[in-house]
Amino acid sequence: DVERSRGLGDVYKRQFQYKSDAEHYYAALKERMAKFNLELEESKSRLIEFGRYAEQNRRARGLGKPETFEFLGFTFYYGKSRKGYPWPKVKTSRKKFEKKLREFKEWLYDSKNQPAKDIVKQLNVKLVGYYRYYGVSFNVYKLSAFLHRIQQFLFKAMNRRGCRRTYTWNGFIDMLKYYPLAKPKVYYPLY
């Protein structure tokens, strides 16, 4: 009696220029996997229209904006370049963004009784790790939003030390001048 293993076999995406090619590949992939007693997870497998013509094709059919997809913690979508051309872009996926915020918030509240210098030092290590993974082209807005939320959590955590308020917002900003938080930057330019 062999127990079936569950989990991620592989996470990958394929791109095709024509819908017929994608449908043919999808059918062949299912058939090929069946030979090895494997199957695709239907809820996680789909064909989407994605590319420079997706917006105008969907608009012509009255379907609205092009679909997006999530892959490795990023949401892939089509936006516009500075010159107005359709351009593939990425941003941190909402689920991963919120999950990391909860983790950072929990850590900050657990560490709030340490000296401010130590908290900021450890926080910077964590922030740089986050930036190094999510620091890609077109994602600076989400990185800046993440830093802003972390600053708010840090302010609240610092004010929950003891019975009285430790910092006003201006005092907190002054403290950050002495112990600055790591700023987001693009580590991996994609284009």
Model-derived regions: residue spans:
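Single conserved hydrophobic/aromatic residue that forms the stacking wall/gate
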Residues: D1-Y12
